Amino acid sequence: MSITTLNIMVAFMMALLGMFVYRSHLMSSLLCLEGMMLSLFMLATIVSLNMNFTISFMFPVILLVFAACEAAVGLALLIMVSNTYGMDYIHNLNLLQC
């Protein structure tokens, strides 16, 4: 295992730890989730370049598309919660039920 791969895995673990520590605020959770997706993208890119399969080059792009969709939905939810309740606490998401 190279030092680059090890650093990317440590970055993923730190973002995962951040999700557990800062789970009360939506903005912090979204930032940690984006850090996780970025480290997964970098790891998938390195693995697909090392495998030398043509079909595996599409996986990082698909992962990046899903990360962009997740970020858009997360930011829309953050704006909706902060405009409605004036704060970004995650426990307010239970109040969004109809």
UniProtKB/Swiss-Prot annotation:
It is found in: Mitochondrion inner membrane. Keywords: Electron transport, Membrane, Mitochondrion, Mitochondrion inner membrane, NAD, Respiratory chain, Translocase, Transmembrane, Transmembrane helix, Transport, Ubiquinone. GO terms for cellular component: mitochondrial inner membrane; respiratory chain complex I. GO terms for biological process: ATP synthesis coupled electron transport. It is a multi-pass membrane protein. It catalyses: a ubiquinone + NADH + 5 H(+)(in) = a ubiquinol + NAD(+) + 4 H(+)(out). Pfam families: Oxidored_q2. The chain crosses the membrane at residues 1-21, 29-49, 61-81. The keyword Translocase applies. It is an enzyme of class 7 (translocase). InterPro entries: NADH_UbQ_OxRdtase_chain4L/K, NUOK/Mnh_C1-like. Its EC number is 7.1.1.2. It comes from the Eukaryota. One of its GO terms (molecular function) is NADH dehydrogenase (ubiquinone) activity. Belongs to the complex I subunit 4L family. Core subunit of the mitochondrial membrane respiratory chain NADH dehydrogenase (Complex I) which catalyzes electron transfer from NADH through the respiratory chain, using ubiquinone as an electron acceptor. Part of the enzyme membrane arm which is embedded in the lipid bilayer and involved in proton translocation. Core subunit of respiratory chain NADH dehydrogenase (Complex I) which is composed of 45 different subunits. This is NADH-ubiquinone oxidoreductase chain 4L.
